[in-house]
Amino acid sequence: MPHLAMLGGNNVQAPRSPAPYGRLMSITPHIVVRGAERAAAFYRDAFGAEEVSRIPIPDGRLMSIQLRIGDGLLHLADEFPEMGVLAPPSIGGTPVVLALNVVDAEAVFAQAVTAGAEIRQPLADMFWGDLHGQLEDPFGHRWNISQHLRDIPNDEVVAAAARAFA
């Protein structure tokens, strides 16, 4: 049976094949927030997200807003407590960190903070070769913002990690 994919903002569905076994597949995070409409606006202002599609339901909540951030997709959904679908504030935090790799980490970091993100870890030149920092968005999701600066051999990264966490 073919899978269905939502295409663009026109909600047209078309068949597509599942990725062949052994082929690279992509993961699209589907995060839960309190206020998907507000979250979509925040992600637009913070990260330049563009809305691809949305699925509202009759009670006014949004089952999904699909956003494009750079080359990736992010789905947002309002909370559905009756189904156990809860946002970070409802569960006391988040066990997941979203990673956003960018060309200019300083600019993206500043833009996200201006939009309302809170700094959890300031940008710093890290031992694995990235300019890296962490933000928490107003909806309780954490974001690692990284800019690759230089390639470092894995054995050197492992040794540096051992020193950093000793």
Predicted features and spans:
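Vicinal oxygen chelate
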Residues: 2-30, 41, 47-136, 146-166
